[in-house]
Amino acid sequence: MSTLLDVRVAAIRELTPVIREYSFEALASTLPGFSAGSHVQLHLPNGRRNAYSLLSDPADTRQYRIAVRQQDASRGGSRYLHQHLKVGDRLRLSPPANLFPLHGEAQKHILVAAGIGITPFLAYSQELLRRGADFELHYAYRAGSSDAYVDELRQQLGPRLHEYLSGQRRLDLASLLQGRTLGTHVYACGPQSLLLDLQEQASAQGWSPRRVHWEAFAAAEPGQPFRVELARSGQQLEVAADESLLEALEAAGVEVPNLCRGGVCGQCQTPWLKGDVEHRDHFLSANERTSSLMPCVSRGCGSPILLDL
């Protein structure tokens, strides 16, 4: 596992009643460089590990910045940050990792964000402006709650920014994707409904999957409690309704490599031998699901799961 970074909370800024920006500075030495689209995992004092996109300019590593929306159904990540984290507090984070990079072969970049999904595109925009690249940003938001960075983006991007204010203008992905040249790539970050709509519309219009990119860091949805047995050690675990299998394994001292914690990256792929599994990931093929699961999001839905761990 990569060496964690020791950081201090340098600043906290309220962007909307439910979104706050956090700036972190290194306690010693300097922060590692990163590329647009990177994220870090925060290791919180309450035991939670949450992944957040870096919204800072990749050319400036004096600080890392993230933005966090307070989730109504938070299991301790966003709630802890909003209610307990203060300037001067110390935290540990993972080094930056990038599962959502800009693609160098793209001749044009279409960025699509909804709500807090704007965060990776703040770093994207600064990098693309520096390159002199051809791009446009489509941002759907609700006034007063999920409209973080709108004023900043208007000044920075001008006509490259296309706004979709809830109740006034609808983001129509079918129209947005029509008639685009083969060198165009589209990137999306936002709720599950946005990502599914993008995949459906792009497929219907014949877009190559190589030109369609998305990121999802949504926390695992709760479900029914279930039991797990580890085949190699014989250890048995109870996974609570509001706990992921990955969290239960970590609490039991079983470390599983992971990055996104949202069923996207494939890093935590784990073999399973028997039991009933509800797969909720966006990574495994139907064939792979017969023998592997993603403990960050997958759950048991009947008989206990036997993992090859």
Curated annotation (Swiss-Prot):
Keywords in alphabetical order: 2Fe-2S, Flavoprotein, FMN, Iron, Iron-sulfur, Metal-binding, NADP, Oxidoreductase
EC number(s) of the enzyme? Answer: 1.6.2.-
Q: Which cofactor does it need?
A: [2Fe-2S] cluster; FMN
- 2Fe-2S ferredoxin-type domain span: 226-309
> What is the UniProt remark on how the cofactor binds and its stoichiometry?
Binds 1 2Fe-2S cluster per subunit.
- Molecular function per GO: 2 iron, 2 sulfur cluster binding; metal ion binding; oxidoreductase activity
Q: Where does [2Fe-2S] cluster bind?
A: C260, C265, C268, C296
The stretch of residues making up the signal peptide is none
Q: Which residues form the FAD-binding FR-type domain?
A: 2-103
Report the top EC class in one word.
oxidoreductase
Q: Which domain of life is it from?
A: Bacteria
Q: Which InterPro entries match?
A: 2Fe-2S_ferredoxin-like_sf, 2Fe-2S_ferredoxin-type, 2Fe2S_fd_BS, Beta-grasp_dom_sf, DmmA-like_N, FAD-bd_FR_type, FNR_nucleotide-bd, MRET
Report quaternary structure and partners: The heme-dependent oxidative N-demethylase (HODM) is a heterotetramer composed of a catalytic alpha subunit, a FMN/2Fe-2S-dependent oxidoreductase beta subunit, a gamma subunit with putative aminotransferase activity, and a delta subunit of unknown function.
Record-stated family: Belongs to the PDR/VanB family.
Main role?
Component of the heme-dependent oxidative N-demethylase (HODM) enzyme, that catalyzes the NADPH-dependent oxidation of dimethylamine (DMA) to methylamine (MA) and formaldehyde. Functions in bacterial methylated amine catabolism, linking alkylamine oxidation to the tetrahydrofolate C1 pool. The beta subunit of HODM binds FMN and a 2Fe-2S cluster, and likely reduces the ferric heme iron of the alpha subunit to ferrous using NADPH.
Q: What is the name listed in the Swiss-Prot or TrEMBL entry for this protein?
A: Heme-dependent oxidative N-demethylase beta subunit
Q: Which organism is it from?
A: Ectopseudomonas mendocina (strain ymp)
